[in-house]
Amino acid sequence: MTKHIAILRGDGIGPEIVAETVRVLDKLIAQGLDAGYEYAPLGGEAYDEYGHPYPEFTQNLCRKADAVLLGAVGSPQYDNLDRPLRPERGLLAIRKDLNLFANLRPAVLYPELANASTLKPEIVAGLDILIVRELTGDIYFGEPRGIRVLENGEREGYNTMKYSESEIRRIAHVAFQSAQKRSKKVCSVGKANVLETTELWREIFEEIGKEYPDVELSHMYVDNAAMQLVRAPKQFDVIATGNIFGDILSDEASMLTGSIGMLPSASLDENGKGLYEPSHGSAPDIAGQNKANPLATILSLAMLLRYSLNDEARAQQVENAVQKVLQQGLRTSDIYEEGTKLVSCSEMGDAVLAAL
């Protein structure tokens, strides 16, 4: 049965990196992948066209699709819009709308990029971490929230951090099942010494862990985890954490690899439907200059093939093509070093197509 993919170009470098990824998808379809795709706007592009960052047209297409591929959202030109209309709100809305509760962000260091990391090669060589982040709860979505005026006339900002047992249980299962396919270690990260939310998180993880006796469970406070990611990152296999801590730690982990431009991500619902996007932002400073690194988006397509289309063979085919291009010494500016060949976004796309 033909699988349907919704493609959202987004803002900034989004259209450029998506264009290269769609060329890869077209080649896979030509080689026999039974899939089709359709475009829809999200973020600033959607606001310009429909007056909303996640319009009804996009909602309908994404709800019907088997998977969604996204470039990036956000641009400084929208910073003065009311908060609900800003591009980033489109991303929060699609996650909530499709009930994408599990965010998987791998941080893998390719041997060819060992020198691109800011850490010593011996500390990061062979790095392979998966951060499993809960995506629809926590302080980003908790109510009540807002800015209010106190009796003394002073303004106060307030947010609510909370997690229910069921929200914690389902992300725990994702973390343990992911670890079973890897090195069988889960590190649950929170701040249980001061936050009741993560005290409950730890308790539930202990309970669910008993269902996975083959997986080793440990716990770490988030401040220590942030330090350990820099001190000795290879101790980690799967890191499982809440929304706000996961947001921060996954960005930190990405820099261990030398470039956030190399890192894909998947956000999944309970049935394997997902939103796939690079971990980096929309990089408006280089938009339209053909400088962006499309590899994270191409690797996001590989995750889409793996998790939503259940096509492990083609997922590996794409990942192998990316590694081959790196072995050939081709680099976009974000991962360039002396002795390698500097290429543009489209030239990197050409190289991946050739490697396929």
Swiss-Prot record:
Complexes and interactors = Homodimer.
The positions annotated for binding substrate are 95, 105, 133, 223
Where does this protein come from, organism-wise? Neisseria meningitidis serogroup B (strain ATCC BAA-335 / MC58)
Using the record, list the residue span of the signal peptide; answer none if the entry has no such feature: none
Where is it chiefly localized? Answer: cytoplasm
Q: Write down the superkingdom of origin.
A: Bacteria
GO CC term (a single one): cytosol
Role: Catalyzes the oxidation of 3-carboxy-2-hydroxy-4-methylpentanoate (3-isopropylmalate) to 3-carboxy-4-methyl-2-oxopentanoate. The product decarboxylates to 4-methyl-2 oxopentanoate.
Cofactor remark: Binds 1 Mg(2+) or Mn(2+) ion per subunit.
Q: Which cofactor does it need?
A: Mg(2+); Mn(2+)
Keywords noted in UniProt:
Amino-acid biosynthesis, Branched-chain amino acid biosynthesis, Cytoplasm, Leucine biosynthesis, Magnesium, Manganese, Metal-binding, NAD, Oxidoreductase
| Family matches, as InterPro entries | IsoCit/isopropylmalate_DH_CS, IsoPropMal-DH-like_dom, Isopropylmalate_DH
- Annotated catalysed reactions: (2R,3S)-3-isopropylmalate + NAD(+) = 4-methyl-2-oxopentanoate + CO2 + NADH
Under HAMAP family, the record lists:
LeuB_type1
Instruction: Give the E.C. number(s).
Output: 1.1.1.85
> A Gene Ontology MF term for this entry?
NAD binding
Name assigned to this protein? 3-isopropylmalate dehydrogenase
Q: Where in the cell is it found?
A: Cytoplasm
Name its GO BP terms in alphabetical order. L-leucine biosynthetic process
Q: Where along the chain is NAD(+) bound? A: 281-293
Per UniProt, where does Mg(2+) bind? 223, 247, 251
Residues marked Important for catalysis (site): 140, 191
Pathway(s) per entry: Amino-acid biosynthesis; L-leucine biosynthesis; L-leucine from 3-methyl-2-oxobutanoate: step 3/4
